[in-house]
């Protein structure tokens, strides 16, 4: 899975995902499925904001890469991918400037056109179930929620999908491609199934002798980037317990 992530995603996204995991004591080389999940979420956030600008009249326009429109204002502020301190600094600045209510949890984006924060979710389950879980957690009508799935489904607050159909189709196509590429490498089942992931992790760790370089301290903290992906992948408490149960050198 680690090789797939490094081949499939932009190096900048990979680097940001590594930093996010390491900040919370998580090892991308061990928790490779989580690594892939964070990269996927980051890429969706970046694709969401790509090519979208606000012109001098305050209207939202789409400008393809390479067009000479440097004076245009980006429609979306990307919050996801920043370290927590900087992310909250950006959020506070936006709230002070616009008067928008400060969110309880770090959102992923801010939409300058609609003047609202956006929470992006990526899931393989029923989108409406994940949407309700996300809404129940956030408990704020001020934060707009937009959920994507690997099957091409989506759900958004009040059926307001923010982006044009073509931009959303680009994201859906990318998610479908990731799924197909994982499946072709035999990685998809373990990526979405905790039971299969447990079996694969046990198999991988048994093949490592001696147990050199494996982490001794197990983290029970959940990284912000991963929270938006649950339950696409196991939460860190379950992952940590699983990892702790298998990080034992085989008896001679």
Curated annotation (Swiss-Prot):
The keyword Lipoprotein does not apply. The record marks 202-203, 206 as: Important for efficient shutoff activity. One of its GO terms (biological process) is viral translational frameshifting. Its main location: host cell. Belongs to the influenza viruses PA-X family. The gene is PA. This is Protein PA-X. GO terms for molecular function: RNA binding. It comes from Influenza A virus (strain A/Chicken/Scotland/1959 H5N1).
């Amino acid at each position: 899975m680690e090789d797939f992530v490094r081949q499939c995603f932009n190096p900048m996204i990979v680097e940001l995902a590594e930093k996010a995991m390491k900040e919370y004591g998580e090892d991308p080389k061990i928790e490779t499925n989580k690594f892939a999940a964070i990269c996927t979420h980051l890429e969706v956030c970046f694709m969401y904001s790509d090519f979208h600008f606000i012109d001098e009249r305050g209207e939202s326009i789409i400008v393809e890469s390479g067009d000479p429109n440097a004076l245009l204002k980006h429609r979306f502020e990307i919050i996801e991918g920043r370290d927590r301190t900087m992310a909250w600094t950006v959020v506070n600045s936006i709230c002070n400037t616009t008067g928008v209510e400060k969110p309880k949890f770090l959102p992923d984006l801010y939409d300058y056109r609609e003047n609202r924060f956006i929470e992006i979710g990526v899931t393989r389950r029923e989108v409406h179930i994940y949407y309700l879980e996300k809404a129940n957690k956030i408990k704020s009508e001020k934060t707009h929620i937009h959920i994507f799935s690997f099957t091409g489904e989506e759900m958004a607050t009040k059926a307001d999908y923010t982006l044009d159909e073509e931009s959303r189709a680009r994201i859906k196509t990318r998610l479908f491609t990731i799924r197909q590429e994982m499946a072709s490498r035999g990685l998809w089942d373990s990526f979405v199934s905790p039971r299969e992931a447990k079996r694969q992790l046990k198999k991988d760790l048994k093949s490592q002798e001696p147990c050199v370089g494996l982490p001794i301290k197990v983290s029970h903290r959940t990284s912000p980037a991963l929270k938006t992906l649950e339950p696409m992948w196991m939460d860190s408490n379950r992952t940590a317990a699983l990892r702790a149960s298998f990080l034992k050198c085989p008896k001679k």
